[in-house]
UniProtKB/Swiss-Prot annotation:
One of its GO terms (molecular function) is methylisocitrate lyase activity. CDD domains: ICL_PEPM. Keywords: Cytoplasm, Lyase, Mitochondrion. It catalyses: (2S,3R)-3-hydroxybutane-1,2,3-tricarboxylate = pyruvate + succinate. GO terms for biological process: threonine catabolic process. This is Mitochondrial 2-methylisocitrate lyase. Belongs to the isocitrate lyase/PEP mutase superfamily. Isocitrate lyase family. Its main location: mitochondrion. Pathway: Organic acid metabolism; propanoate degradation.
Length: 518
């Protein structure tokens, strides 16, 4: 006789088998999970559901793989508005991006700069709104086409309104479980891919250009694992873009992970702590900024390896570097032991002295730092994105070639900022013209301008507001209305507004009126 417990065990074993079979499919087999199928089966949802997110993710995956194989790229921009999303489809874009920064400026009760301090469901809600509008546009287009004769239908334009949505997951908004809840909401909203970064929340000081802080490598991987686990629990094909914001970071929250130790800065002179120096400056009326700069100069901040180099003879340093090259990562204590072994003089190094009032450690990342984090994260996601707000071609090239040395077929993303002066950074006009295609050859198959909505629309709004203010309705008709009517810009057409679709709904629902006896 089969008991309820026996049935439960059989269902569990069947689910484990189904999960393992799913993980063996081409897309899923690339992911290396630190947990088992049995763990997922224990945590999985009891009521099974299929999420449109999976359909969109598979569509996106095939699109990106095709571009990656051809050495080309698909380009898009950041949107938070359903109307703009529909225009991306009309323009022939293949994806759209929902930026957390733009949502934080436009879709919340209390706007703010890019601290990711808005509610965790802000971006999922924006995705949900856009995805619903995409479905509506696809439906009303289908209905309009099918009301026409076959020959006439062939002449009608047809747009792909169901563009896959890539969305900003920021840093996951807190603990593992809050990250998983956010991920669940994203999947339910219809997103095709989300990205998660390695930043610490709310520590940037924008006006002085300081404060970019990353979390330890282990915490970054824990965030990504939480997202992947939630995808698996929901049986979702949703893609994960592993974004690394370590480039130009100044601080790290913790030194718990030996993989980060090579890049942590310490004082190499025996002085008071930075916090004490700043307190003394405050009490005497000295500028905190100047006091900080003075302390950093006196502390002679270096990484431990730099401190070794400044202390050792050339031969001693050569022996030290040879010793630490025998394995990928050495903790600070291992480095200190090797320094004691190979150097005749003591190396003074204290990474506690420079710690900030927020507890941050000074950090000195290099392109190699970003490469190491990206390689560590790659098994958990389908794509990699190294955020470079101040990109230099040699750094872009070095990063992507460094990761491809380990993962030759890796797909990459890249985001362009809205205020970076490419000319001042040494890019010629010809280099800038070819930048998109040159990066595509490095495997960067998805490229985005996240701040499009702010920069382009703000500029257009000011330009046309000035015309309206100066020339009134005459200016509007001449500069907006007449060109829009000539160019078939969406706005009030019966088809785009869904009037035919609405009338069809009314007609279908009113079919029973024919049965009313008169």
């Amino acid at each position: 006789m089969t008991t309820d417990m026996d049935l439960e065990q059989l269902e569990y074993e069947k689910e484990v088998e189904e999960i393992e079979k799913w993980w063996a499919t081409p897309k899923q087999s690339q992911i290396k999970r630190p947990y088992t199928a049995s763990t997922v089966a224990v945590l999985s949802e009891v009521t099974k559901a299929y999420y449109p997110s999976s359909q969109q993710a598979l569509k996106l995956y095939d699109l990106l793989r095709e571009h990656r194989n051809k050495g080309t790229a698909t380009l898009t921009y950041g949107v938070v508005d359903p109307v703009l999303a529909s225009q991306a489809s009309k323009a022939g874009l293949e994806t759209i991006f929902v930026s957390g920064c733009l949502c934080g400026l436009s879709s919340v009760d209390e706007p703010g700069m890019d601290h990711a301090d808005y509610p965790w469901d802000t971006v999922p809600k924006a995705v949900d709104r856009i995805f619903r509008s995409q479905n509506w546009h696809a439906r009303r287009q289908k209905q309009f086409h099918l009301m026409k004769p076959a020959e006439e239908r062939k002449q009608l334009p047809k747009y792909d309104y169901l563009l896959p949505i890539i969305a900003d997951g920021d840093m996951g908004f807190g603990s593992v479980t809050s990250t998983m809840k956010m991920t669940k909401r994203f999947v339910e909203s219809g997103v095709a891919m989300i990205h998660l970064d390695d930043l610490a929340i709310g520590l940037k000081r924008f006006t002085v250009g300081q404060g970019r802080t990353v979390v330890p490598t282990s915490e970054y991987l824990r965030r990504l694992t939480a997202v992947r686990l939630q995808f698996d629990i929901m049986k979702a094909e949703t893609m994960l873009l592993c974004r690394c914001d370590t480039d130009h970071a100044e601080f790290i929250t913790s030194v718990v992970d030996p993989r980060d130790h090579a890049y942590v800065l310490g004082a190499t002179t025996k002085i008071e702590s930075l916090i004490k120096a700043l307190k003394d400056a405050e009490s005497t009326g000295v500028s905190m900024k100047k006091a900080r700069e003075n302390w950093i100069e006196r502390a002679k901040l270096m990484t431990f390896d730099e401190a070794v180099k400044s202390t050792a003879t050339p031969k001693e340093y050569e022996n030290y570097i040879s010793a630490i090259s025998k394995k990928p990562f050495h903790s600070i204590s291992e480095r200190q032991e090797l320094a004691e072994k190979y150097l005749s003089n003591e190396v003074f190094f204290d990474w506690e002295l420079p710690r900030s009032s927020d507890g941050q450690y000074f950090f000195k990342p290099t392109v190699q730092t970003v490469i190491e984090r990206a390689i560590a994260a790659a098994p958990l996601g389908e794509m990699t994105w190294a955020r470079m707000d101040y990109p230099k071609w040699q750094d872009i090239k070095a990063f992507h070639e460094g990761v491809r040395a380990v993962y030759p077929d890796r797909m990459f993303a890249f985001g362009f900022t809205g205020n970076y002066d490419f000319k001042a950074a040494g890019f010629s006009e010809e280099q800038l013209r070819n930048l998109t295609s040159d990066m595509a050859k490095l495997g960067v198959c998805w490229q985005v301008q996240p701040y499009f909505t702010c920069q382009v629309l703000n500029k257009a709004s000011v330009d046309y507001s000035n015309i309206w203010k100066k020339d009134g309705i005459f200016g509007y008709v001449k500069t907006v209305q007449e060109p829009a009517l000539k160019e078939d810009v969406d706005g009030f057409e019966n088809e785009w507004c869904g009037t035919y679709f609405a009338d069809k709904l009314l007609s279908a629902a009113g079919s029973s009126d024919k049965t009313i006896p008169y």
